[in-house]
Amino acid sequence: MEVNKVRIHDLPEEDRPRERLIRSGPESLSNAELLGIVLRTGSKEENVISLCSRILAEYNIKQLSLANVSRLTQVHGVGKAKAAQIAAVFELARRLETFVEEPKRKICSPKDVYALMYPRMREQKKEKFITLYLDTKNQILKEEVVSIGSLNASIVHPREVFKSALLESSASVIMVHNHPSGDPSPSREDIMVTEKLVEGGKLLGIDILDHIIIGDGRYVSLKDEGFVR
């Protein structure tokens, strides 16, 4: 069988481009192999690596990035679907060049948490418990809904709160939940949950900075109330 007709699937696993990328990283592959992973299949006449080698013999990387679908389909074996895949990859690369990451929101006080969360929580009909995961500069890395419904210690378990904290390499956590009644005064259950999570954070070396309860146009900081120490 001719080499260019050997299906990629029939190659030894250690020689397949996708498996090599997973094992050794994308930098270990040739341009034709990388493009082959994108296109996935060749034609009846040749395998995908042979097809990609022909494409790259006709267009260098720069030229390929600028070729539109109409031009790409002039290459034998490249239909509209494959041409669209190539165009999409290079368009993503162009967008990466101009991408500017939005600055992370920094939390300096309970008032900052209230300003951020109140517009989204004021009309909630059920209690929603949310955690904000922060970096060492108190910038928000991630926001996550932990539970919906009446807050109690059996629902809000430290495992659920700190799992994401560890995955995000968070330095600290701020907890937020709402009181649909409009009164942000902490209940006995609120205090118990807070104390349980503070102790869990100490064991893992993750600071619980505060637990903010949001009511109707006002809030309570359990740190200010002395329950977060």
UniProtKB/Swiss-Prot annotation:
Residues 106-228 form the MPN domain. InterPro entries: MPN (IPR037518), RadC_JAB (IPR025657), UPF0758 (IPR001405), UPF0758_CS (IPR020891), UPF0758_N (IPR046778). The keyword Magnesium does not apply. CDD domains: MPN_DUF2466. Pfam families: RadC, UPF0758_N. It comes from the Archaea. A motif (JAMM motif) lies at residues 177-190. This is UPF0758 protein MA_1979. It comes from Methanosarcina acetivorans (strain ATCC 35395 / DSM 2834 / JCM 12185 / C2A). The lineage of its organism: Archaea, Methanobacteriati, Methanobacteriota, Stenosarchaea group, Methanomicrobia.
